[in-house]
Each structure stands twice: as C-alpha cells, then as structure tokens.
A protein has these predicted regions:
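Compact, glycine-rich, soluble single-domain proteins
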Residues: 27-79
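Beta-strand/loop substructures that line and gate deep hydrophobic ligand-binding cavities in soluble
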Residues: 77-104
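Well-ordered alpha/beta subsegment
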Residues: 101-128
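Solvent-exposed residues in well-ordered beta-strands and their adjoining turns
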Residues: 7-9, 55, 81, 93
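Short amphipathic alpha-helical/adjacent loop interface patches that line ligand
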Residues: 14, 56, 115-118
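Short glycine-/small-residue-rich flexible loop motifs, especially phosphate/cofactor-binding loops
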Residues: 18, 35-36, 119
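Conserved active-site and cofactor/substrate-binding residues in soluble primary-metabolism enzymes
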Residues: 8, 12, 33, 109, ...
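Terminal, regulation- and interaction-focused segments at domain boundaries
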Residues: 1-25, 123
Length: 128
C-alpha cells in the first residue's frame, strides 16, 4: 500500500483526499464511516476511520475489458484514519500487489498505471 500521514484533522484529510483523487481522474463511489457503522451494528467503539471507494472510470473500463473478474477488486479503497495527536493517515492499496493473484500480464501493466495515479494522489496530499 501507499501511505502518508498528515498533520490535519480527519475531516480535512478526507476533503483533501477527495480533491486529490479528483485531480487524478478518480471519483469517490462509496464512503464508509467504519466507526459509525461498528457503533450502530455491534455497539463497538472504534477510532475515526473512513473507507473511500475510488474509481477512475476510464482505467476501470480498460481493466474490465482485459479481465472480467477484476471487478472483484474494484473500486480502489483508500483509508483515511485518525493517527492520534491531530494527525491523520491516508493509505491506498497498491494495485500491482493486489493484481498479482490474477495471471494476466496486460492487467499488471494496467495496474501499474493505476498505481502511478494513486502515488500521485499521495504526493498531492503532501504538497496540499
């Protein structure tokens, strides 16, 4: 995975992450508030933790044409979580690592393109 720790509160990190994703062509299809969900479903307390389901439609379409089972790994999840002390960690899956389970060389090339975009998202967070 790729990760960055930011010296900002969670809500600001979520907003920055969504903006950086948009700049790289990703839309956020889902947003799961894990702490809220765990509290509602099982009464468990958990630190502030969000999962953003990000998708670049063009790259997803290309990947699906190469391998129809790749949909089991979509969208790309990006985690934004409280790291304590007013800091927030943002982490995204490395698609090259996750796609190793699928034996399709063309898909690995596509995963590298997605990975480069997610790394660019992380870099944008640092300079934001």
């Amino acid at each position: 995975y790729f990760a960055r720790t930011l010296d900002v509160p969670l809500e600001e990190a979520v907003a920055r992450t969504k903006a950086a994703l948009a700049e790289e062509g990703f839309g956020v299809l889902t947003e799961i508030d894990v702490a809220q969900t765990l509290k509602a479903k099982i009464g468990a307390d958990f630190r502030p933790y969000r999962i953003l389901g990000a998708c670049n439609p063009t790259l997803a379409h290309e990947a699906l044409k190469l391998e129809d089972k790749v949909g089991t790994m979509l969208p790309c999840n990006v985690v934004v979580q409280d790291a304590g002390g007013g800091r927030t960690e943002v982490a995204a899956i490395d698609p090259v690592a996750s796609m190793q389970a699928i034996e399709n060389p063309q898909l690995r090339t596509q995963a590298a393109r997605v990975g480069a975009k997610l790394q660019a998202v992380m870099q944008r967070l640092v300079i934001a």
